[in-house]
Design a protein with these regions (language model features):
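Hot-dog-fold acyl-thioester-processing enzymes
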Residues: 1-75, 136
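HotDog/MaoC-like acyl-thioester-processing domains
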Residues: 1-13, 86-136
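Mid-chain, well-packed structural core segment of small domains
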Residues: 67-95
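Hydrophobic alpha-helical context, especially transmembrane and signal-peptide helices
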Residues: 47, 52, 81, 110, ...
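Generic detection of short hydrophobic beta-strand segments and adjacent strand-loop junctions
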Residues: 14-20, 81, 127-129
């Protein structure tokens, strides 16, 4: 993909992630070191009034995976997100993205969204990436 081939408004291919499972959350807790029981213990989730929720960083990682399937990781220069809603076990996440702006020096600015199957936005973010030019 070259900078010259990209237009503002272009969408990137959707990345469909499998349903979030409790086993996945336990494994992620071990891998990340985030053992907050809100992510793994039903009673704690109930006391908090939310039930078990996925780690925000897990959803952010999925969004980053989407971005890096579109732009090589070494070319991503900025990645910022805001968490919009909690993600719960049983939800499937879809990562979408589109080009918002083209800048000088082959830089594109894009939006990335993580949504569940009902279209609820769980995470919204902005990224910048550098693309190769046909003229280089």
């Amino acid at each position: 993909m070259y900078y010259e081939e990209i237009n503002v408004g272009d969408s990137f291919p959707t990345l469909q992630k499998d349903e979030i499972t409790r086993v996945q959350l336990v494994k992620y807790a071990g891998a990340s070191g985030d053992f907050n029981p809100l992510h793994t213990v039903e009673e704690v989730g109930e006391q908090a009034g939310t039930g078990i929720i996925a780690h925000g960083m897990l959803i952010m990682g999925m969004a980053a995976q989407g971005v890096t399937t579109w732009i090589p990781r070494k070319n991503v220069k900025k990645f910022q997100v805001r968490f919009k809603k909690m993600t719960k076990p049983g939800e499937s996440i879809e990562i979408t993205g589109k080009v918002l702006e083209k800048k000088e020096n082959n830089i594109i600015v894009g939006e990335v969204l993580a949504m569940n199957s009902e279209g609820e936005v769980k995470l919204a973010g902005i990224f910048e990436g550098v693309l190769p030019s046909k003229n280089d």
